[in-house]
Structure formats: C-alpha cells, structure tokens
Amino acid sequence: MGKITIVNIDDCVACGACSGTCPQSVLEVNDHVEIKNPDDCIGCGACVDACPQGVLKVE
C-alpha cells in the first residue's frame, strides 16, 4: 500500500470528512487538510473516498 499525498490543496474546503474517516489519525484539518503523521499512514484510502473535492490521493 502507498502513502497519502495532497494533490489539490486549493480545492480543500476544510470539511473534515477525510480526517474523521482516517483510522490512523494521519490528517488534521484547520484552514485546509494537513498530513500530520505521514509515517502512520497505512494507505487504506478511506480519506480519499471520503473527500468530496478530490484533494487526496494514495501513491
């Protein structure tokens, strides 16, 4: 499995759907999404599926 990356940061609307779905608490959302614990990412893609804006990608 890969790791999460941010591909369209300007499209982030800070809804929090991604961080609320992540089982590893890798993401934090304030004004926009940030990857706070990248080494903890298990590459499950839950955050990618939850994001309505397509901001995230697992590579």
UniProtKB/Swiss-Prot annotation:
<keyword id="KW-0249">Electron transport</keyword>
<dbReference type="GO" id="GO:0046872">
    <property type="term" value="F:metal ion binding"/>
</dbReference>
<feature type="binding site">
    <location>
        <position position="47"/>
    </location>
    <ligand>
        <name>[4Fe-4S] cluster 2</name>
    </ligand>
</feature>
<dbReference type="InterPro" id="IPR050572">
    <property type="entry name" value="Fe-S_Ferredoxin"/>
</dbReference>
<feature type="domain" description="4Fe-4S ferredoxin-type 2">
    <location>
        <begin position="31"/>
        <end position="59"/>
    </location>
</feature>
<keyword id="KW-0408">Iron</keyword>
<feature type="binding site">
    <location>
        <position position="15"/>
    </location>
    <ligand>
        <name>[4Fe-4S] cluster 1</name>
    </ligand>
</feature>
<feature type="binding site">
    <location>
        <position position="51"/>
    </location>
    <ligand>
        <name>[4Fe-4S] cluster 2</name>
    </ligand>
</feature>
<protein>
    <recommendedName>
        <fullName>Ferredoxin</fullName>
    </recommendedName>
</protein>
<dbReference type="GO" id="GO:0051539">
    <property type="term" value="F:4 iron, 4 sulfur cluster binding"/>
</dbReference>
<keyword id="KW-0813">Transport</keyword>
<dbReference type="Pfam" id="PF13237">
    <property type="entry name" value="Fer4_10"/>
</dbReference>
<keyword id="KW-0677">Repeat</keyword>
<dbReference type="InterPro" id="IPR017896">
    <property type="entry name" value="4Fe4S_Fe-S-bd"/>
</dbReference>
<feature type="binding site">
    <location>
        <position position="12"/>
    </location>
    <ligand>
        <name>[4Fe-4S] cluster 1</name>
    </ligand>
</feature>
<feature type="binding site">
    <location>
        <position position="18"/>
    </location>
    <ligand>
        <name>[4Fe-4S] cluster 1</name>
    </ligand>
</feature>
<feature type="domain" description="4Fe-4S ferredoxin-type 1">
    <location>
        <begin position="2"/>
        <end position="30"/>
    </location>
</feature>
<feature type="binding site">
    <location>
        <position position="41"/>
    </location>
    <ligand>
        <name>[4Fe-4S] cluster 2</name>
    </ligand>
</feature>
<comment type="function">
    <text>Ferredoxins are iron-sulfur proteins that transfer electrons in a wide variety of metabolic reactions.</text>
</comment>
<feature type="binding site">
    <location>
        <position position="22"/>
    </location>
    <ligand>
        <name>[4Fe-4S] cluster 1</name>
    </ligand>
</feature>
<feature type="binding site">
    <location>
        <position position="44"/>
    </location>
    <ligand>
        <name>[4Fe-4S] cluster 2</name>
    </ligand>
</feature>
<dbReference type="InterPro" id="IPR017900">
    <property type="entry name" value="4Fe4S_Fe_S_CS"/>
</dbReference>
<keyword id="KW-0004">4Fe-4S</keyword>
<keyword id="KW-0411">Iron-sulfur</keyword>
<keyword id="KW-0479">Metal-binding</keyword>
